[in-house]
From Swiss-Prot:
Entry keyword annotation includes Transferase: yes
Protein name per its UniProtKB record: Aminomethyltransferase
Cellular component GO terms, alphabetical: cytosol; glycine cleavage complex
E.C. number(s) listed in UniProt: 2.1.2.10
Organism: Exiguobacterium sibiricum (strain DSM 17290 / CCUG 55495 / CIP 109462 / JCM 13490 / 255-15)
Subunit structure and binding partners: The glycine cleavage system is composed of four proteins: P, T, L and H.
NCBIfam families, A to Z: gcvT, PRK00389.1
């Protein structure tokens, strides 16, 4: 895909001069500004911000909206209060994953679904198959910008820009109000393993918010650091830990899958995985030989390929070459493995996940 055909976020014009831009999910996005290590460390120790305006916003409303979402999503939507968010998975009939997403309950009959950039059109088409009754599904992805402000100093820095009492917004809750002079939705959530907020505002206002955050010394961060941060925290990335052939149960997301509570697309398969246990599961590995395992690298036991790496790198906080790997459940308690990297079999040992957990 040539650069001229790539989509651009509302922040492109102010980000492109200082960011190293790459093709990500059909968008021209910054992979880094200074370095992945510097940006990663800024989020772990202070505060950083990410342009995540490429994410999709699908609005669902109507008197049958709840029933529609209960049928199509994995979690129990009836448990979401107005002002609350919930992690969910959109599943295939066979239990494979269409996408993972956040659901915000905006009002009694109004919901916002925030989906992965690479899956916006696919998710919308999948959901439309099940539309019935009084439900309106609107794709308003182009109308909104999204900036994620993440790190232990996020509350302190953002509080200077808003009259909203940010400490009162608990994890996976949100408020609507003015921040940096812009009306927006302020969600206490994120994808880094740190405290932080995801800010949703009209596209036309995104640049003003970004500039206000720059003036407050928030460090601009690219998708490279976003990936190493989420990986250390063992948060799944669609196309890696979740896919059409990897179920949310296999990926360790069973907390968001409620087939015992309700029937939904894929629930017949997933209830069996919950009751009997999945045939595969994700484990953490650390390479004890020198090297870095990347996605799809074969994982071996006793010389036999039994699984594959979903994500692998040498992330800044951990400082060791680690990986997540999908292996048959019967091998998940093995202590030693090999990972094939560039034709060489490198020794690895199983380690606990998540690799990083922030101190409260």
């Amino acid at each position: 895909m040539s650069q001229t055909t790539l989509k651009r976020t509302p922040l492109f014009d102010i980000i492109a001069p200082t960011g190293k831009m790459v093709d990500f999910a059909g968008f021209e996005m910054p992979v880094l500004f200074s370095s992945i290590k510097e940006e990663h460390t800024a989020v772990r120790e202070r505060v950083g911000m990410f342009d995540v305006s490429h994410m999709g916003e699908l609005f669902v409303s109507g008197s049958d909206a709840l029933a529609f979402l209960q049928q199509t999503l994995s979690n129990d939507i009836s448990k979401i209060a107005i002002g609350q968010a919930q992690y969910n998975v959109l599943c295939q009939e066979d239990g494979g994953t269409v996408d993972d997403l956040l659901v915000y309950r905006l009002d009694e009959q109004d919901y916002l679904l925030v989906v992965n950039a690479s899956n916006i059109e696919k998710d919308e088409a999948h959901l439309r198959q099940y539309l019935t009754g009084d439900v309106l599904l609107e794709n308003q992805s182009d109308a909104y910008g999204q900036i994620a402000v993440q790190g232990p100093k996020a509350v302190e820095v953002l509080q200077e820009l808003t009259a909203l009492k940010l400490e009162d917004i608990k994890f996976f809750r949100f408020a609507q109000g003015e921040l940096a002079g812009v009306e927006m939705l302020v969600s206490r959530s994120g994808y880094t393993g740190e405290d932080g907020f995801e800010l949703y505002m009209p596209s036309a206002d995104a640049s003003a918010v970004w500039n206000a955050l720059l003036e407050a010394d928030v460090v601009p961060c690219g998708l490279g650091a976003r990936d190493t941060l989420r990986f250390e925290a063992c948060l799944p990335l669609y196309g890696h830990e979740l896919s059409a052939t990897i179920s949310p149960i296999e990926a360790g997301m069973g907390f968001a899958v409620k087939p015992q509570v309700k029937s939904f697309v894929g629930s017949e398969v997933l209830v069996k995985q919950k009751e009997d246990g999945p045939r595969r599961q994700l484990i953490g590995l650390e390479l004890t030989d020198k090297g870095i395992a990347r996605q799809d690298a074969p994982v071996l036991v006793n010389g036999e390929t039994i699984g594959f790496v979903t994500t692998g790198t040498l992330p800044p906080t951990i400082g060791k070459a680690i990986a997540l790997a999908l292996v048959p459940t019967e091998y998940a308690t093995e202590e030693t493995f090999e990972i094939e990297v560039r034709g060489k079999k490198l020794a690895a040992k199983r380690i606990d996940t998540p690799f990083y957990r922030r101190s409260k």
